[in-house]
């Protein structure tokens, strides 16, 4: 097994999605393993209760420390990876973080629920990640796309390295426009350069369109790009209506 990912959750059935498609095939090939552990199984009370009212009052319930910490400690006996908590205090997840985490051989993800976790659990957490400044039902909803993004970059998961190096965000830009057959669809034609067979012109077109899309749709990303002289010339050329 190349990579081991363990997920601590109250809802393990939500992660059955990883049994399908690209990630499912990678698991079948033993390129990686994704295991879930039900935090509720580590409770010490007869009702298997994992939450309680917050000290000081307030709305909602808080996940108690004991079952979470005992679950972490149990998993740690077979997985020495960092504990990653999906929570609002964390750094916003992006492609650069996905690249970094995909190089880890072992990872443990902790999914919170309700109004959050007891503060004392944080001393057992190595990294906190957020998917954005909005509210979701639980950490599971954040964990699924994060794990999927990481797994796609593990060698052998995709058919070729090129499959992910040309995708949006991998190099900090949006992916160029894509087309497939038919060549003509209700008056709309595939750009001629893509059916020309001229590989260098196709490369330039794709690169220019990638930058222009990023500039127009995600100016925040575009501002961070270090453009070469060729890049600036290509952008100017295609923005002025040039076609190959």
From Swiss-Prot:
Residues where S-adenosyl-L-methionine binds: 112, 131-136
InterPro entries the UniProt entry points to: Alpha/beta_knot_MTases (IPR029028), tRNA_m1G_MeTrfase_C_sf (IPR023148), tRNA_m1G_MeTrfase_TrmD (IPR002649), tRNA_m1G_MTases_N (IPR029026), tRNA_MeTrfase_TRMD/TRM10 (IPR016009)
GO biological process: tRNA N1-guanine methylation
The EC number(s) this enzyme carries: 2.1.1.228
Keyword Transferase: yes
Any single Pfam family the record assigns to this protein: tRNA_m1G_MT
Catalyzed reactions: guanosine(37) in tRNA + S-adenosyl-L-methionine = N(1)-methylguanosine(37) in tRNA + S-adenosyl-L-homocysteine + H(+)
Location relative to the cell: Cytoplasm
Chief place of localization: cytoplasm
Keywords: Cytoplasm, Methyltransferase, S-adenosyl-L-methionine, Transferase, tRNA processing
GO-annotated molecular function: tRNA (guanine(37)-N1)-methyltransferase activity
Top enzyme category: transferase
Keyword 4Fe-4S: no
Highest taxon above the source species: Bacteria
Record-level GO cellular component terms: cytosol
Oligomeric form and interacting partners: Homodimer.
Similarity comment: family membership: Belongs to the RNA methyltransferase TrmD family.
Role description: Specifically methylates guanosine-37 in various tRNAs.
Protein name: tRNA (guanine-N(1)-)-methyltransferase
Species for this entry: Clostridium kluyveri (strain ATCC 8527 / DSM 555 / NBRC 12016 / NCIMB 10680 / K1)
Gene transcribed to yield this protein: trmD
């Amino acid at each position: 097994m190349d990579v081991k990912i363990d997920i601590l959750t109250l809802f393990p059935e939500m992660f059955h999605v990883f049994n399908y498609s690209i990630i499912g095939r990678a698991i079948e090939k033993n390129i990686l393993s994704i295991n879930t552990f039900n935090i509720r199984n580590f409770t010490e009370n007869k009702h298997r209760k994992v939450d309680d009212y917050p000290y000081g009052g307030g709305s909602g319930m808080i996940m108690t420390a004991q079952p979470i910490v005992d679950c972490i400690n149990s998993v740690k006996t077979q997985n020495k990876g960092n504990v990653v908590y999906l929570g609002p205090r964390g750094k916003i997840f992006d492609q650069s973080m996905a690249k970094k985490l995909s190089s880890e051989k072992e990872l443990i993800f902790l999914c919170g629920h309700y109004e959050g976790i007891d503060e004392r659990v944080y001393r057992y957490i190595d990294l906190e990640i957020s998917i954005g400044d909005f509210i979701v039902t639980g950490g599971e909803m954040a964990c699924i796309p994060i794990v999927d993004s990481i797994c796609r970059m593990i060698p052998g998961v995709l058919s070729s390295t090129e499959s992910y190096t040309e995708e949006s965000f991998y190099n900090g830009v949006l992916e160029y426009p894509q087309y497939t057959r038919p060549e003509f669809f209700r008056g709309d034609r595939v750009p001629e350069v893509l059916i020309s067979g001229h590989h260098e012109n196709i490369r330039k077109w794709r690169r220019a369109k990638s930058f222009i899309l990023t500039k127009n749709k995600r100016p925040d990303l575009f501002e961070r790009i270090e453009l070469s002289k060729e890049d600036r010339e290509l952008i100017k050329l295609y923005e002025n209506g040039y076609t190959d």
